[in-house]
Amino acid sequence: MIKTLFIILLCGILSACQPVDIQDVDIAAPAPKRTVLKVGTLYGPQIYLNSEQGESGFDFEMAQRFADYLAVPLEMIPYTNRKQLFAALKENKIDIIAAGIAKTPNRSQQFKLGPTLYKVNQVLVYKEGTPEPKDISTLSGEITVMANSSSVNTLTKLQKDYPELMWNQVNDKDNEELFALIANGELNYTISDSNSLLINQRFLPELRAGMILEEKVEVVWLLPPNNSDRLMSKLLAFWHKERRAGTLEHLNEKYFGHVKRFDYVDTRAFIRAIDNILPEYRSFFEEYSGELDWRKLAAASYQESHWNPSARSPTGVRGMMMLTQPTAAYVGVDDRLDAEQSIRGGAFYLKDMMERLPDTISEAQRIWFALASYNIGLGHVEDARRLTESMGMDPSAWRDVKKVLPLLQQSKYYKQTRYGYARGSEAVHYVDSIRRYYDTLVWIDNQTKTMEIIEEKEQVEVIAEEVPAKSHVSAQ
């Protein structure tokens, strides 16, 4: 069921990961003054999503900050058609495009480009289990990309060195549909930016990254080519302010930092477990999570025990949440092998860790510090925070503390701390893994709900069609 769900809905939810070039559109009249900031975007987990938990995405968060900087409300306007998105900017229907757009010569000619958000590599994508390509010149005719995309720009550059290089262009499929076709073995190769591939691997683990075809491609916002000097000036001032504040680094860590480590076997196993094991315990996670998103608690439990109530480690921790005897006693768990008790106790302990953290840590980041504390202890995390501050970094930012945690394994650093040696790199891996599990679980959970809505709507339509027919038969 999950596999089918991926292929059917991957396009709709993640359609924004691969930007495309646009065709020339006539310039419209100057834009009137606006009382809101209208930002055109595309749907995608790293760009813009609007779910039960509210709006999210790298571009959304930056756009919200920019609107706050301008002291105007933000209006995000999602487009499903890229051509319409670019035309809307040319026609002054929107003020900015913030949609994970790659910088290309064509876009530089047609738009004003904002400062660089981040950089990506253009990589060859192929299927797990097939031979990894070593020479781009041997793949002529086997690469399929979207027409007018930045992938075409990459291939055109390569063609100068490999004149025989040819590729297939499709107009009726987007990048995520191409990913699904690669995963199913229906296509051999495509090209993607590295971040989009890493994000999609959480849902389609069969995707593999091959050779890097173009390095450090800039991702930018787009502004109208004319009558946007004032907005560009404000954007540049805002950008410098946010860079100094570490906002770009924080958002890069939030949306991309945890997806850079990919494990094919583990991802496939987790997807199967969501379908086969989680339903038995989901109600416990929902009941005891409280204000915490139940999927974060479930992700932590999978990292601990792979949802095995009888799990045991060599150090003596046991159960779904792998509690020690002292911790079990502290949270009121009598039987660590009882799944419900273990989940209840683990949830209580995790929330207790969150409450004991300093108030300087933001609500959004407290969970990551709490999970690290769950893994190696609150004392060691506080040691890492103090070291972080002594190095001139932010002790309340997970992006900085995760850099310092591995230093607790080096005597040069841990001898300066109160609690001494700790496996800090293990804690970083622990938190990153939970974040990946959580992202995958959220995606699958949202798609399941979408499918249920679609099926319910179809059933209503079928019933509506049948009722008149039955009434007509009765009248006879």
UniProtKB/Swiss-Prot annotation:
Residues 260-476 are annotated as: LT domain. Keywords: Cell outer membrane, Cell wall biogenesis/degradation, Lyase, Membrane, Signal. The active site is at E304. It is a peripheral membrane protein. GO terms for cellular component: cell outer membrane. It is found in: Cell outer membrane. GO terms for biological process: cell wall macromolecule catabolic process; cell wall organization; peptidoglycan catabolic process. Its EC number is 4.2.2.n1. It catalyses: Exolytic cleavage of the (1->4)-beta-glycosidic linkage between N-acetylmuramic acid (MurNAc) and N-acetylglucosamine (GlcNAc) residues in peptidoglycan, from either the reducing or the non-reducing ends of the peptidoglycan chains, with concomitant formation of a 1,6-anhydrobond in the MurNAc residue. Gene3D superfamilies: 1.10.530.10, Periplasmic binding protein-like II. Pfam families: SBP_bac_3, SLT. It is an enzyme of class 4 (lyase). Residues 1-16 form the signal peptide. Its main location: membrane. SMART domains: PBPb. The keyword Zinc-finger does not apply. In the N-terminal section; belongs to the bacterial solute-binding protein 3 family. In the C-terminal section; belongs to the transglycosylase Slt family. The N-terminal domain does not have lytic activity and probably modulates enzymatic activity. The C-terminal domain is the catalytic active domain. PANTHER family: MEMBRANE-BOUND LYTIC MUREIN TRANSGLYCOSYLASE F. Murein-degrading enzyme that degrades murein glycan strands and insoluble, high-molecular weight murein sacculi, with the concomitant formation of a 1,6-anhydromuramoyl product. Lytic transglycosylases (LTs) play an integral role in the metabolism of the peptidoglycan (PG) sacculus. Their lytic action creates space within the PG sacculus to allow for its expansion as well as for the insertion of various structures such as secretion systems and flagella. This is Membrane-bound lytic murein transglycosylase F. It comes from Shewanella frigidimarina (strain NCIMB 400). The lineage of its organism: Bacteria, Pseudomonadati, Pseudomonadota, Gammaproteobacteria, Alteromonadales. The gene is mltF.
